[in-house]
Structures are given as structure tokens and as C-alpha cells.
């Protein structure tokens, strides 16, 4: 495992290994054990798309592992504009021990990983969000005591979260149901890859336009914002189309009685989810947010340690 670009690229064993390491690092950190796995190492963090949770979790995680996080905004680095991605990768590999990148175009991450001889971590693209899903799987395990045989239902936009959740569920031995409106389905190539992963795992992938069908008996119920960065002009239209996909108390009743609710945040209460659900007793969103730190520490320790 040289990079973390997509969970589709990893084996089930590699995914489970990252989750086990994340849980171990979390437990030991809470017990006061310090880790210096990355002492003397520097992680360059490229952000062309801003994020509270991503920056804080990677900076704190790198520091807790004894390394140094170097923040690079779009003002500091012009990825693919002016200087080529090839030249950028070749310069950074001489000075850094790893690169984390959060950006719009997935191809930029693929190019960076191809050209740089140091590990590259995908911290989000418009296509995929693998680090978030590792945190989601970790959180599911903490609350359910297992992953194998559980069902996750995702209700909403067929976006990067839906894509990575399909990959993650397949690798973890979970069933997955995705409910999206017509014309807002998941990317066709990602779906084809995910179907291959589910065939190997022997688990079920359901793709539907019916949120009730998707959520039926689900152990984990997941949603995400209807309007991602760069889609602000479509806000009113999207809200109208997606309102039947709101995760509210009525829809949530169709899930398993002990289902947990997840959201990668930021959340917009009253739109993709109601306060009743997101602030209710079955919501685990802040455990999930915290686990970004621990899951990503496992990724950094594995790739850079």
C-alpha cells in the first residue's frame, strides 16, 4: 500500500488492518500513551478545497504521531496552474515524507500519486472521500461490535460520499443500499467497480430511487449535504428535488430499531436531516467526526511509518 486514493484499490485485509490500527491508536492515546511513529517526518497538506474537520484532524494527528504538518493553501501552491503537477510532485517529494490533498478534480490526485515517489493521501475529491469512510466504519464497529453482515443505507445525492461508502461497505463485508433521485445517481464507473467489489465479498448492493426501500432494516443510516461546494447556483432546485429524501423521524422508523445515524458534516438541519434525527439518541455524528483523527492517524502511520 503506497497511497490511499480509493478504498476500491485496497484489499479487505488492508481496510480491516487500518481500522484495527485506528482503534488501537485511539485507545492508547486515551490511556495517555504517546506515539512517535512519525518523528522527524513532514506531511504536506494541500488544500484547494477548505475544510474544518480535514485540516484539524490531519494537523492534530500528524502532531500526535510526532511529525510536522505543513499547511499549503491554494495561495501557496498552484496545482496544475502555472507549474505542472509533475514538477510540483517532483519538488515536494524531495522535501516531504508524504502529501495529503483535498481538492476538486480527482485526476489531480491520481497524477500526484503517479509522479511523486512519496505516499499520497486523498483527503477528498469530487469523486471520492476514503478517509471519511474509514472513520465511518470505525464508528460503526465501536457502536455495533462488528461490521460483517450489517446493512448501511445512504439517502441523498450520488456524490463522493455515496461512492466511497459503496467501496467501504464491500471491503468491510457489509450490505449497502443507496437511494438517490433520478438524474442524481452515482457515477457509472464507480458503480461498476463497486459491483465487482460486492461480487467478491458476497454482499448485496441495492441502487434505488426509493428511500423507504433503501432504509428498510438498515443498521446504519447515512446522509450528506444536498449542495456540495461548487453547486451553490443549483441550491434552490436541488432542495426541491431532494426534499422527499430528507432523513426524518418518519423515514428513520423503517430502519432497524437500534440503527445509528451518521453524517460526514457539515449538516444543514431541516434539509437533508431533521433536528429530531441528527440531535437524537441514535445519532453518532460527533463520534464519527472524532474518528477522522484516529482513522487518518492509522493511514499516516501505515504509509509513512
What do these predicted regions represent?
Residues 1-56, 60:
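Positively charged, low-complexity intrinsically disordered leader regions
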Residues 195-276:
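Rossmann-like adenosine-cofactor binding region
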Residues 258-259, 265-305:
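Adenosine-phosphate binding glycine-rich loop
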Residues 35, 90, 97-168, 263:
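Anion-binding alpha/beta catalytic cores of soluble intermediary-metabolism enzymes, centered on
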Residues 65, 95, 115-116, 172, ...:
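Short, structured coil segments at secondary-structure junctions
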Residues 48-60, 144-223:
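Glycine-rich phosphate/diphosphate-binding loop of Rossmann-like nucleotide-binding domains
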Residues 42-43, 47-95:
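Active-site cofactor/substrate anionic-group-binding motifs, chiefly glycine-
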